[in-house]
């Protein structure tokens, strides 16, 4: 496995945030059954909460998928404003964009430091780059963290990730099972992770192992459906 090093500054930030934002982690022992580089963590979004909790508390090496717009300085502000900040009623409207501009350099530094893989949604040709980078990372022994919820699947006039529970999924990520098998000759394991804000708890469930005996589309849908069902059940607990 190629060692994945995070900059000292990123490690310090994680350590500090863990101290001021403590959580419990359940199910970490389940990861011992899987090989490094075969694991795809599939986590709920919960607005910004899921990514923060997962990044801080998943107990293994991984590289996260991050929307490409979150890695481009000129696009972060508007993306985060409409995805999350617009709905934060406790914050005066006139402060929202200036606050996002203030934290943009910090976010870019963090995403670079955790070796994030850009996701080019709505750009089919560029999206293939996402899959190539992911397969390269898995070949090198790095696990992957994915947040597959669709922020746009809401009633008309509304957008953004749902605050509680699990929203509808994009299912394309599940093709990584077939791709990992075809390219790296290993079975991917899709591991559900639910971040519960109310309980301050990150729960890791049993993994769903890719089955190469199934048809490509059948297996993609099976994996995506099982993951959604598992995460939805975890949200109700």
Predicted regions and their residues:
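Soluble, non-transmembrane catalytic domains of enzymes that act on hydrophobic metabolites at membranes
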Residues: 1, 12, 16-19, 140, ...
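Amphipathic alpha-helical segments that form well-ordered structural scaffolds
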Residues: 12-15, 106-110, 176, 226, ...
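Structural motif corresponding to alpha-helix initiation and N-cap regions
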Residues: 25-28, 104, 128-131
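Structured helix-beta-strand junction loops
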Residues: 19-20, 37, 113-114, 140-141
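Helix-to-loop junction immediately C-terminal to a conserved catalytic motif
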Residues: 13-47
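Non-catalytic C-terminal accessory region of glycerolipid acyltransferases
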Residues: 121-237
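Catalytic core of membrane glycerolipid acyltransferases/transacylases, capturing the structured
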Residues: 35-121
């Amino acid at each position: 496995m190629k060692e994945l090093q995070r900059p000292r500054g990123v490690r310090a930030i994680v350590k500090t945030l863990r101290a001021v934002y403590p959580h419990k982690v359940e199910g970490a022992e389940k990861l011992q059954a899987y090989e490094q580089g075969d694991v795809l963590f599939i986590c709920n979004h919960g607005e910004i909460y899921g990514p923060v909790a997962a990044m801080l508390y998943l107990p293994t090496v991984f590289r996260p998928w991050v929307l490409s717009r979150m890695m481009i300085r000129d696009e972060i502000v508007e993306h985060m404003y409409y995805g999350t900040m617009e709905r934060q009623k406790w914050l005066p409207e006139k402060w929202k964009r200036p606050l996002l501009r203030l934290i943009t350099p910090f976010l870019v530094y963090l995403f670079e430091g955790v070796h994030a893989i850009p996701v080019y949604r709505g750009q089919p040709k560029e999206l293939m780059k996402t899959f190539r980078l992911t397969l390269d990372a898995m070949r090198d022994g790095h696990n992957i963290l994915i947040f597959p919820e669709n922020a746009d699947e809401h009633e008309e006039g509304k957008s953004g990730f749902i605050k509680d529970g699990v929203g509808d999924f994009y299912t394309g990520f599940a093709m990584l099972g077939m791709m990992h098998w075809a390219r790296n000759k290993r079975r991917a394991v899709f591991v559900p992770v639910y971040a519960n804000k109310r309980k301050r708890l990150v729960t890791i469930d049993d993994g769903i192992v890719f089955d190469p005996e199934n048809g490509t589309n059948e297996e993609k849908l099976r994996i995506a459906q099982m993951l959604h069902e598992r995460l939805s059940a975890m949200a109700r607990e």
